[in-house]
């Protein structure tokens, strides 16, 4: 039996959206504006939380870390995407591809854990208000956030090592916006069963574990809200959770679509659109989501803007 000759791949060629030549410049400008809005919005949120003493609470402590992670999350993906559009496709070494995949997985995992932690924080505030300050102490806050970073690192390390023990050969074109595991598996020339199991484990344990914490927390919150007699009290309590629920639905909805389904075949246009939602749009919208429905954030923003205005001369 004749042996098949394979060309070993040591670098990849990212080509997402480059087939639409007429959209290259508009897409570049759109993604660049989204990235700048993400950086401005999330940096502004962090500075606002640190600068206003009224926002020095556990909820905003977790939100500031979510904003920090969103900045890093976007920065790991969007600059490379802009290079792909500007250069009409770009070459990336296997080492850089592995680094990008690690950073994406690291920050995406932390996002999952932080959203679950924020749901638990809301549950404690609504359902156990008298014990809130004794449960969510400063030590507990730092412990939860540190745990999210450590768990995110472990998840990213395992997935990256597992993915890049594969042999890649033949076609080196990745028709996707960044180095993600599903498109990489399509380029492997060996048995990728172990790597596919890792995808399933991540999809069936990490995300659902976070979602379970969120669902259980909000189940208790809904029960507590229904027991409030005044309509105004119910509305006020629910409004403190509505922003978080919106962010959860947007983030987990797109991730579930990407990972809890069949990944065979070539990356479709729909895959790339969904990947743009969770890597570009969601980090940009988070500061807006938490600002529009949050009275404390709006008041802090107005206060900061009033301070920045030059004083009028008499």
Curated annotation (Swiss-Prot):
What is this protein's record name? Olfactory receptor 9Q2
**Superkingdom classification of source:** Eukaryota
Q: Where in the cell is it found?
A: Cell membrane
Sugar-modified residues = 5
Tell me which SUPFAM superfamilies the record gives. Family A G protein-coupled receptor-like (SSF81321)
Q: Which CDD domains match?
A: 7tmA_OR5-like
An example of a Gene Ontology cellular component annotation for this protein is: plasma membrane
**Disulfide bridge partners, by residue number:** 97-189
Q: Identify the keywords attached in UniProt to this record, alphabetized.
A: Cell membrane, Disulfide bond, G-protein coupled receptor, Glycoprotein, Membrane, Olfaction, Receptor, Sensory transduction, Transducer, Transmembrane, Transmembrane helix
Which species?
A: Homo sapiens
Which residue ranges does the entry give as Cytoplasmic-facing topology? 47-54, 121-139, 218-237, 293-314
Give any single GO term for biological process.
G protein-coupled receptor signaling pathway
Which ranges make up the Extracellular topological domains here?
A: 1-25, 76-99, 161-197, 259-271
**MF term (GO), any:** G protein-coupled receptor activity
Q: What is the annotated role of this protein in its UniProt record? A: Odorant receptor.
Name of the encoding gene: OR9Q2
Protein family: Belongs to the G-protein coupled receptor 1 family.
Q: Give the way it sits in the membrane.
A: Multi-pass membrane protein
Membrane-crossing segments per the record: 26-46, 55-75, 100-120, 140-160, 198-217, 238-258, 272-292
């Amino acid at each position: 039996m004749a042996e098949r000759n394979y060309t070993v791949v040591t670098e990849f060629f990212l080509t997402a959206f480059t087939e639409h030549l007429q959209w290259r410049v508009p897409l570049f400008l759109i993604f660049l504006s989204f990235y700048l809005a993400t950086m401005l919005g999330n940096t502004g949120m962090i500075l606002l939380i640190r600068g206003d003493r009224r926002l020095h609470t556990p909820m905003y402590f977790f939100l500031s870390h979510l904003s920090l992670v969103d900045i890093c999350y976007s920065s790991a993906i969007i600059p490379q995407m802009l290079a792909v559009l500007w250069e009409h496709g770009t070459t990336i070494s296997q080492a850089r591809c592995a680094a990008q995949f690690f950073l994406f997985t690291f920050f995406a995992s932390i996002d999952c854990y932080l959203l679950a932690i924020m749901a638990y924080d809301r549950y404690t505030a609504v359902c156990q208000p008298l014990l809130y300050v004794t449960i969510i102490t400063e030590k507990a806050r730092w412990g939860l956030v540190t745990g999210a970073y450590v768990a995110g690192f472990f998840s990213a390390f395992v997935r990256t090592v597992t993915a890049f023990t594969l042999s890649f050969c033949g076609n080196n074109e990745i028709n996707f916006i960044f180095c993600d595991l599903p498109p990489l598996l399509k380029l492997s020339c060996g048995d990728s069963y172990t790597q596919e199991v890792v995808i399933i484990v991540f999809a069936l344990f990490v995300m659902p574990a976070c979602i379970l914490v969120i669902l259980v927390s909000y189940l208790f919150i809904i029960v507590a809200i229904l027991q409030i007699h005044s309509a105004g009290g119910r509305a006020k309590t629910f409004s403190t959770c509505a922003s978080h629920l919106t962010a959860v639905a947007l983030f987990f909805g797109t991730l579930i679509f990407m990972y809890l389904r069949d990944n065979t075949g070539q990356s479709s246009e729909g895959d790339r659109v969904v990947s743009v939602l969770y890597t570009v749009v969601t980090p940009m919208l988070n500061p807006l989501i938490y600002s529009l429905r949050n009275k404390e954030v709006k008041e802090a923003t107005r206060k900061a803007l009033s301070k920045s205005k030059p004083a009028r001369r008499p």
